[in-house]
Amino acid sequence: MASDEKTGYWLFKQEPECYSYADLERDGRTIWDGVTNSLAQKNLRQVRVGDRILFYHTGKQKAVVGEMVVVGGPRPASDGDRHVVVEVEPVGRLLSVTLEQIKADALLSDWDLVRLPRLSVVPMTLAQWQRVQELSGTGRAE
C-alpha cells in the first residue's frame, strides 16, 4: 500500500495474552474493541479506512511486532454505545522493535508511546512510522 498525505499512522497496544498478532493472523481480521480511555477513544475516532497501524505487544514483551491496516470504521461499538471500534486486517509481522530501542532513539523518544505509557491508541507521524520500520530492518519476520 502506497503512502500518501491522507494516510494516517497509528500504534495500537494489546496484551498478547488477551489478543496477539498471531491471533490476528489466524483470524484474518478483527474488530478492535475494548478501548475505553477517553484520549484513546478520541484518537480511535480519527482513524480512517486505509490507515496503517503498528501492533504493539504490551506486558513483558513491550515491542512492536506487526503491521495492520484499517478496513472498517470507526463505528459505535454497539447500539447506543459512546465507544467506537475499527476493523483491522494483518499486513505482516515485523522484526520486533522494543520499547527500549524506541526510548533510545532520538526521533522516537518524545513520542506519546513513551510519554503516555498507558495510552492504547497512539498517533504517529510519517517520520516516526518510517523510523520504526527502519529499526525493524524494514524486514518482515517470516
Region locations from a protein language model:
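Charged phosphate-binding loop/patch that engages nucleotide di/tri-phosphates or the phosphate backbone
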Residues: 124-142
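Short, acidic Gly/Pro/Ser/Thr-rich loop/turn segments
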Residues: 17-19, 95, 131
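Aromatic- and Lys/Arg-enriched surface recognition patch
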Residues: 65-126
